Amino acid sequence: MPRYAVKGGEVTLKCDHSVRLEHLHKVEWKKGDDKLFMYVKGRTPPFKAWEIPGAKLNTRKSSEKQIHLTNLTFAAGGSYYCVVSMETPSIFTRDSDFKDLTIIDPQDDDPKITFKKDTYYIGEMLEANCTTAPSKPPPHITWLLNDVKVRDSFTKSFSNGIVHGHGYFETKASSIKQLSMEVSQLEDGKLRLTCMATIPGYVNNDSDYADIRNSTVYIEILEESPALPSPVEAASSATLLTLNCMLVVLFLWLF
C-alpha cells in the first residue's frame, strides 16, 4: 500500500492475502471503525460499498484483493486495513496491519537558493538560504554539497510564517533552511550546491519520493584572497610619498 497519494488523484489499496478463492468467505476494508467496502463470496452482487470521506470508490477497479479510490482530498488520509474471513473448516477472521495513507498537495515550483555572492575564497564563510514552494505538508529541505549530504550541524531551519490557502485542509506552507559553513579546498575550483525539497524527508539521492524538487547553483572557489599590504609596508609607502612631496616643494622653492 502506498504511503502517500496526491490531492485530486487516485490510489489503489491492496489487501495481500494467500487465501484461495474457494476457501474465502469475506473481505472487508475499514478505516478506523468505519466500513468502506465488503466482498462476500456467493452474494449477488458480491460487493457492498459505503461512503468514503474524502474519496470516491471505483467499484470496477475494486475486488476481493484491492480497492481503488479516486478524487482524493485530505479527508481521505488516515489508517486503513482489511479483514479477511475464511469459511473452511470453520469461519476464521484475521485483520491486517494498519497502513497509514497521507494525502499531499505537492510543490508547484523548484526551491529558490539565495546567497550574497557567487565567488568565495578558501576559508571564507558561505551562507545560503533555500526557500521552497508551498505544499501540504511542508517540504523537508536537504542541502547537498557536490552531491553529498551536508551535516545537519551546518544547517538551520526557519519558518517564514506565511500560510497559503484558507481552512485547515487547504492550507499550505513553505520551508526555509539556511546553510552556513567554511569553504574548503576543492580540486576543480567549483562548488556545486543543491537544495532538495522532498516529501517525505531525505533518505538518499536515489530514493523514491512522493514529491521532490531540486535546485542547483555553482559557486567559484578561489585559492587565495587578494593580498593586503602589511602595516609596515603601508607605513613605508606613506613615508616615501611624504618624502617625494617634500622634494617637489623644495625643488619648486629653489627654482
Annotated model-derived regions:
Residues 1, 106-114, 226-229:
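Proline-enriched interdomain boundary motifs that mark the N-terminal boundary
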Residues 1-5, 18, 114-120, 132-133:
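Short beta-strand segments of immunoglobulin-like
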Residues 10, 75-79, 125, 188-192:
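Extracellular Ig-like/FN3 beta-sandwich strand-entry sites
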Residues 14, 55-100:
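Ligand-binding face of N-terminal immunoglobulin V-set domains in extracellular IgSF glycoproteins
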Residues 20-53, 136-160:
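N-terminal V-set
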Residues 51-66, 165-180:
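Aromatic sugar-binding surface patches on proteins
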Residues 79-105, 191-228:
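Extracellular/luminal immunoglobulin-like beta-sandwich modules
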Residues 236-255:
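Cleavable C-terminal sorting propeptides in eukaryotic secreted/cell-surface proteins
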